[in-house]
């Protein structure tokens, strides 16, 4: 048996996740340090927000706190940023927005304070600019005052051009917080057809972006952009997300979906959130915000790059080889594309999890260790299952009434003969059903062995 498989920490993690699964939560909260696990538990018990939403929002907040200050290197020339595109899916009233507000509050507080500082500095700047150069010199002020910039983390609806300007002033990174994600992707074609979507495809990979502004002498050059995205979306409009080229150009595959098993409306209770919970969460994020970083001669951040220990890298490669075998057996190109993006995400998860543990005093940040890799694997498996569930919903939305009726009548596990009988009873010919079955392997159905199948979402 491998040494990492009998580590006591892994056994404790499994026990924690078993407990949460029994309560109807699939998100592996054991990936977080004990301090953050307690925060998630208290927020859930007090407000009845789904644990999946709280955990996903907290994961994204930690990623934003890291931003461009730390990167992870898997091998020479292959470096990843902790960029996440996260979508919380649920029915109206499913408490999707409130967990986001809790997780992002430290950034809101920071942005508010920085805006106060900016307003004062801007008033002073305007006052100086209203003076002549001679008057400024005589009063002991700078001859050529520098216009102040507003430091911030959070942005909402903004064009790529406006976003580039804000990012140039905030090189640590930004987070697009869209309460309704549908507004984000519906705006992709509002100006130049498809250009905004291409912008977000590039940002996901942290590719250099250049924005040429109208009537400007210089371009805005972002060497390594960092913009994470998080927001909510209703289950019934998921199909909007897959419209146009978004399902064929891999855009939708870059989104991490969170869809709790339990979609019940929260019941009110008398439990109050302990005062120290919000304080502890603020302290965790503020430690990330306040960490020092080095700027080079061009004003660019020199990130701290984390490598993997040999054991950690060995475990990661072992997982990837197994995952590649899944891809080789998969006949659905859409599913293969999702798996390929998850191979990128697992590296990013490693960085986020290691830094979360460091922030809570559970480890150092010299290397990414095996415990972090194991936790990243569990998180990746969670998002894999979520992505498959979303694909199933998208495919069901695309079914005609006859196909939908047959899918509904099929048992969770079935043979080809059973399925053909149900299909024929509903007016579908055998050959047509065989084609329908084969076309939906990996999205609606899973092939167990020759002649035997199961429904992905029974």
Residue ranges and their predicted role:
Residues 1-458:
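Phosphate-handling catalytic cores of nucleic-acid transaction enzymes
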């Amino acid at each position: 048996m491998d040494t990492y498989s009998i580590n006591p920490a892994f056994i404790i993690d499994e026990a924690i996740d078993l407990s949460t699964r029994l309560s109807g939560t699939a998100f592996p909260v054991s990936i977080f340090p004990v301090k953050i696990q307690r925060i998630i538990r208290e927020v859930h018990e007090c407000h009845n927000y789904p644990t999946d939403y709280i955990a996903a929002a907290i994961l994204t907040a930690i990623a934003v706190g890291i931003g461009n200050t730390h990167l992870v290197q898997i091998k020479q020339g292959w470096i990843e940023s902790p960029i996440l595109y996260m979508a919380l899916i649920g029915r109206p009233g499913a408490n999707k927005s409130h967990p986001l507000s809790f997780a992002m509050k430290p950034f809101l507080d920071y942005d508010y304070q920085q805006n106060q500082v900016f307003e004062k500095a801007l008033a002073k700047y305007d006052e100086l600019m209203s003076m002549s150069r001679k008057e400024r010199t005589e009063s002991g002020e700078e001859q050529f005052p520098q216009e102040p910039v507003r430091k911030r983390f959070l942005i909402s609806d903004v064009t790529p051009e406006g976003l580039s300007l804000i990012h140039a002033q905030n090189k640590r990174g930004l987070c697009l917080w869209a309460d309704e994600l549908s507004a984000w992707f519906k705006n992709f074609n509002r100006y130049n057809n498809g250009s905004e979507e291409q912008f977000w495809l590039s940002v996901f990979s942290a590719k250099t972006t250049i924005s040429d502004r109208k009537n400007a002498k210089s371009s805005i050059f972002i060497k390594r952009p960092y913009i994470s995205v998080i927001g909510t979306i209703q289950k019934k409009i998921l199909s909007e997300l897959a419209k146009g080229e978004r399902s064929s150009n891999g855009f939708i595959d870059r989104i991490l979906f969170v869809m709790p098993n339990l979609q019940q409306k929260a019941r009110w209770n008398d439990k109050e959130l302990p005062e120290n919970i919000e304080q502890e969460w603020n302290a965790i994020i503020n430690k990330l915000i306040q960490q020092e970083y080095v700027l080079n001669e061009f004003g660019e951040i020199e990130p701290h790059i984390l490598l993997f220990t040999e054991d950690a890298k060995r475990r990661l490669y072992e997982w990837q080889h197994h995952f590649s075998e899944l891809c080789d057996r998969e006949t659905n190109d859409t599913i293969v594309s999702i798996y390929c993006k998850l191979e990128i995400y697992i590296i990013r998860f490693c960085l986020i999890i290691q830094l979360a543990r460091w922030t809570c005093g559970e480890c150092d940040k010299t290397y990414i260790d095996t415990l972090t890799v194991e936790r990243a694997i569990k998180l990746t498996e969670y998002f894999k299952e979520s992505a498959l569930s979303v694909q199933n919903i998208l495919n069901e939305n695309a079914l005609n009434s006859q196909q939908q009726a047959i899918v509904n009548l099929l048992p969770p596990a079935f043979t080809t003969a059973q399925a053909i009988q149900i299909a024929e009873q509903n007016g579908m010919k055998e050959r047509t059903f065989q084609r329908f079955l084969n076309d939906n392997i990996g999205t609606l159905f899973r092939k167990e062995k020759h002649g035997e199948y199961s429904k992905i979402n029974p």
